[in-house]
Curated annotation (Swiss-Prot):
Entries under SUPFAM superfamilies matching the protein: Immunoglobulin (SSF48726)
PROSITE patterns reported in the protein's UniProt record: IG_LIKE
Protein name: Ig heavy chain V region M511
PANTHER family: IMMUNOGLOBULIN HEAVY CHAIN (PTHR23266)
InterPro entries associated with the record: Ig-like_dom (IPR007110), Ig-like_dom_sf (IPR036179), Ig-like_fold (IPR013783), Ig_sub (IPR003599), Ig_V-set (IPR013106), IgHV (IPR050199)
Entry keyword set: Adaptive immunity, Immunity, Immunoglobulin
Amino acid sequence: EVKLVESGGGLVQPGGSLRLSCATSGFTFSDFYMEWVRQSPGKRLEWIAASRNKANDYTTEYSASVKGRFIVSRDTSQSILYLQMNALRAEDTAIYYCARYYGSSYWYFDVWGAGTTVTVSS
């Protein structure tokens, strides 16, 4: 069974930092692109970060809203995806999800975690 389990959310003051984790199991972690997506209150899902697969050297990509503040990384030995979030702002308040990105004839997020909640407030 393929599983993604996020953790690390919480309440943090503006300007603070958090590190989210996404523990994965049931598939070959290195073969897949892995993504972070968030949903702020009352807003649509927003893609924020990608970690490409081993074949693409685990290169990363970020949305403009988090670039320079957030860092996505992997622990390939433990099959964990991370999101280091720095210089947090009130607008970063959201539920954060990790998702597996799957490609065949087209690309889509085929497995999601349940999410972890981040609240940025003083």
